[in-house]
């Protein structure tokens, strides 16, 4: 992360348990061992020795005398430059860099099971000496909080609103169109024909990490996402997804990855949101300084 050496690193100060979990270094090592084992051409898969090591790396550890209010370093989750992502919504002033952090424990909010995010806009050209060794939490609540570094290859696509937000008449037309495609596929003599396209998974909202566009509400159904400061309807800023595509959205699989095993190319970030969901982060279009909101789908 492009973080000034003289600027305090974001920390979670909310009171919650933080004294038991897996060590980030163990999580990264576990992934490396497993990836290496399955990449072998001969006898792929972990050896007995590797399985023993993997078991050790999966162990949870306790932090003696850890307080529920000790400053807990957040984990850098995403760093997006406007030069790389043309559709990145406007930040305050002439800021060109968005940085996203999260607390590595699901222990926030009234039910003590919510996420905690921290978003920071900055002007990249103002950063002088860069922090080379950011603080890390000693343990994390789950391995999905620890991202693997990835190089972005942004691609612009057209998105459309979630089906539940469309007018009823239009939804009925889409349903009839999908039924006609399914019937046509069933009657086709060509059994190699792929599954017919559908609005939900193939045409409206792509899976994976993305900036802008429309949010999916497939888990909760739509509900108002208005700014808590000025009541303005908020716009989707960023989607953080647990996978780049899945069985229901295979039409979005990149052509370059058509012949790669699914488990190797769908989760490059190794980030897991809740129970394999997606995190939609919203921003106020009138004032990007206003607090962000988010939903998990």
Each predicted region: which residue ranges?
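Preference for intrinsically disordered or flexible, low-complexity segments
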Residues: 1-297
